[in-house]
From Swiss-Prot:
Residue stretches spanning the membrane: 51-71
Assigned protein family: Belongs to the FtsL family.
Biological role stated in the UniProt entry: Essential cell division protein.
Gene from which the chain derives: ftsL
Segments on the Extracellular side according to the record's topology features: 72-132
InterPro entries attached to this UniProt entry: Cell_div_FtsL
UniProt keyword list: Cell cycle, Cell division, Cell membrane, Membrane, Transmembrane, Transmembrane helix
Broad class of the protein's primary localization: membrane
Name of the protein in its database record: Cell division protein FtsL
Keyword rRNA processing annotated: no
GO BP of this protein: FtsZ-dependent cytokinesis
Cytoplasmic face residues: 1-50
Length: 132
């Protein structure tokens, strides 16, 4: 014959209810608890790891903002320096062209001959040299 299984008798602690609870009363009590909850109690619900993670996230965002601003200012300073260098370079080129033109005008053979004649010098072909 088959033996009967032993039944366990579990006793659950069930509170005795005097009056039935209405669902609207439960919602009101839940709302009251949340509305009177202090911010410090809300912060206590956040774990230490989450707090550290939030602080690190905020610090990294602030760091990225600061670094971005520094990079932008560095870029603008570099661009200004490049522009100044280009302007100086252009001025030097213009000055160089101007001086070369002046040199070529001053070193023309006709001009040298006319100045020599004014000074009372005579022209001897053997003593003339080309000016470069």
């Amino acid at each position: 014959m088959a033996e009967l299984k032993k039944m366990r008798h579990n006793h659950y602690d069930v509170p005795v209810m005097d009056e039935p609870v209405i669902a609207s009363q439960i919602k009101k009590t839940n709302q009251k608890k949340e509305s009177f909850q202090l911010p410090q109690k809300k912060l206590n619900k956040i774990s230490v790891f989450e707090k550290i993670l939030c602080i690190l996230l905020l610090c990294s965002i602030v760091g990225i903002v600061v670094i971005t601003i520094q990079i932008r200012t560095t870029i603008s300073e570099t661009m200004n320096n490049i522009t100044e260098a280009q302007v100086k370079n252009e001025r030097k080129k213009e000055e160089m062209l101007k001086l070369e033109q002046e040199k070529s005008e001053l070193s023309k053979a006709d001009r040298i001959k006319s100045i020599g004649k004014k000074q009372g010098l005579s022209e001897i072909d053997g003593n003339l040299r080309k000016v470069k």
